[in-house]
Amino acid sequence: AYSENDSHALGTSYSDYETRVIAGNTFDYPAIHGEAIAQSGYSYTSASHKAVAEGHISLGDYPIVDLIVGKQRTTTIGRGVSGYHYEAISDKLQEALSLYTAEGGNLLLSGSYILDDLWHGPMSTDEDKEFAKNTLHSSFGGGMASRSGEVYAPSTKFLRKRLTLTFNTTPSEEVYSVESPEVVTPVGKQSYTILRYAHSDRSAAVAYNGPDNRTVHLGFPFETITDDEERTKLMAAILKFLSKN
């Protein structure tokens, strides 16, 4: 009886990853993005979200901004006595991005909870949704969009050659896993789907081709694409699109 109780004390589950090292937050994602940027023939520099939100960095100095959001979303720390932290895109960052794009700046952003946090986060407001629609030109179409991480590019004016790629959805040593990629729905006539999840055919990424600026929004973190060549091909296509404005 005691042996049986011991085996169930912490819950019953499989032991697939019991002896394996699992990647967490390695904090090197600007380098991963940067490698794909450099391989595409562009130079880059990096800064923190906080530096941008607090005005230490002028986004207007750069023709293209790549916003790395990863799996960040609003949450509490410990028992939650200090309130909520880690919004995917804070109010101040929203202001900076809205001003940047209104003045002609071109934006790439990727993450798995960006729209979910703006729509359903514990601090979300109607203004958050309007920011997504008016600045990101996208809206929340749902989470849990893919278990396989397989994505393909339909033939569009964004990418005429068919591209397939896979992002990580299982625990691994190389990069963190994406449990809930989101469906990114285009908003407006000038916004359209450029990537789809292979098994559901739902929208995985959206491009906006406006009169004054362009944006690309991925519903999964760019850095979790498992193949270096696939990352570079996608980044090259994105930068080519964003550079045309």
Where do the model's predicted regions map?
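A glycine-centered loop/beta-turn motif at secondary-structure junctions
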Residues: 106, 134-135, 143, 162, ...
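Alpha-helical scaffolding within the catalytic cores
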Residues: 50-56, 91-96, 200-205
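Loop/turn elements at helix/coil->beta-strand transitions in domains of secreted/extracellular proteins
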Residues: 38-45, 60-64, 102-107, 189-190, ...
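Aromatic-Pro/Gly-enriched surface loop or interdomain linker
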Residues: 1-61, 222, 236-245
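Solvent-exposed loop/turn segments at secondary-structure junctions
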Residues: 51-54, 69-75, 107, 113-117, ...
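A glycine-rich, often tryptophan-bearing local segment used as a flexible ligand/cofactor-contacting loop or short
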Residues: 73-180, 191, 196
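Stable alpha-helical elements in mature extracytoplasmic
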Residues: 29-33, 89-96, 231-238
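The substrate-binding groove and active-site-proximal loops of carbohydrate-active enzymes
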Residues: 17-25, 67-88, 221
